[in-house]
A protein has these predicted regions:
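N-terminal beta1-alpha1 ligand-phosphate binding loop
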Residues: 2-34
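Helix-loop-strand module that forms the ligand-binding subsite of alpha/beta enzymes
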Residues: 57-127
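N-terminal beta-loop-helix "entrance" segment that forms/cooperates
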Residues: 42-59
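Short, flexible hinge/linker loops that cap or flank conserved catalytic cores
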Residues: 1-2, 103
Length: 127
């Protein structure tokens, strides 16, 4: 049996009917059974606050654990006001505060997005 590849999808949108979360769900359906694809839930991740870094809230601890355990990341990034969606930026801020950005080290990251007009190109550029 092939080893399992663990991929974590992170959507920058908190909307229930998000196109970007839908894009992650579609990607999950396209993968073989040897790939474990989870989608992180950012809905309860509070705004980053440096004063809370020593006692991270449970949703933040869960996110850090998911990123750490993943072999690769897929970021689905909507574009809000010509830049990165706040929920995604906030999640990246929390995880990047770990010593030496350890959860991200050595991980391949794919970036995708769904949107009208210019799509999500400007947000992807900022990432």
């Amino acid at each position: 049996m092939n080893p399992t590849l663990n991929i974590l999808g992170i959507s920058g949108s908190l909307r229930a009917q998000s196109r970007n979360t839908g894009l992650l769900r579609f990607a999950k359906q396209c993968l073989p059974p040897t790939v474990n694809f989870q989608i992180a839930d950012l809905s309860d991740v509070p705004f980053y606050n440096a004063d809370r870094c020593d006692s991270k809230p449970e949703p933040v601890q869960t996110l850090i654990r998911q990123v750490t355990e993943a072999d690769a990341l897929v970021l689905a990034c909507p574009e809000y006001n010509y830049s990165i969606a706040p929920a995604l930026k906030n999640a990246l801020d929390w995880v990047s505060r770990e010593p030496d950005c350890a959860p991200f080290n050595g991980k391949p990251v794919a970036i995708m997005g769904a949107g009208g007009g210019m799509g999500t190109s400007r947000a992807q550029y900022h990432l």
